[in-house]
Each structure stands twice: as structure tokens, then as C-alpha cells.
Design a protein with these regions (language model features):
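Sec-dependent N-terminal signal peptides
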Residues: 9-18
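C-terminal partner/receptor-binding element of secreted or periplasmic proteins
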Residues: 82-117
């Protein structure tokens, strides 16, 4: 194998491995109360980050503290088993003003986070 061919092979290998690593990295998006709408906003802060981890574990992340909160059962199980450190979602989830005693729905956020998987 000549030098030029070897250089091309190494470059191709590096591109393949770096793109595979990029595909495996969890996706993260930021959503704001303004973007989602005040009537659907479920959190006690103006914006949060959403992420999907391997295995479809969905989390909300507080952008100022980087504390994470499980958004679905898969994420809850990861926290319960000690695989991931997180706080309960109820810490940042607000009450539903139209339904006393109930919290705002997490469905719009679960839907958005699932698109990252």
C-alpha cells in the first residue's frame, strides 16, 4: 500500500469513527415558556433543556444548575437503579391552575424529547 492510499484510508477511518460517535451522543435542545406557550408550560423556570439518552431515557435539565430530572419511566428506572443521578421532576413541575391538586402535563415535553431519540 503506498503512502497516499494509506493516508486516504486513515482519513476515511477517522471520519467514520467520528461520525459514529456524533450519532451516539445524546441530543439536547432548549425550550422556553415563550416558545411552548404559558398555558402548556409545566416548569417553574423560563427555559429548560430536553434530552434523550441511549435506551430512550428522557430527561429535563435545568440549564442554570445542570440538575437533571427524569421525564419518562425509563429515566425513572435509571435513577432508581443508581445508573443516573437526578432529582424528582416534581421539584420543578408547577401546579395546574385549572385543576387544583394536579400538576401541569408533561406530555408536550415528552413528545418533544422523544423526537431527539
Amino acid at each position: 500500500m503506498d503512502y497516499e492510499m494509506m493516508k486516504k484510508s486513515i482519513l476515511a477511518f477517522l471520519l467514520l469513527t467520528s461520525s459514529a460517535a456524533a450519532l451516539a451522543a445524546p441530543q439536547v435542545i432548549t425550550v422556553s415558556r415563550f416558545e411552548v406557550g404559558k398555558d402548556k408550560w409545566a416548569f417553574n423556570r423560563e427555559e429548560v433543556m430536553l434530552t434523550c439518552r441511549p435506551g430512550n431515557a428522557l430527561y429535563v435539565i435545568n440549564p442554570s444548575t445542570l440538575v437533571q430530572y427524569p421525564l419518562n419511566d425509563i429515566a425513572q428506572k435509571e435513577v432508581a437503579s443508581g445508573k443516573t443521578k437526578a432529582q424528582p421532576i416534581s421539584v420543578i413541575q408547577i401546579d395546574d391552575p385549572n385543576n387544583p391538586g394536579e400538576k401541569m402535563s408533561l406530555a408536550p415535553f415528552i413528545e418533544r424529547a422523544e423526537k431527539l431519540c
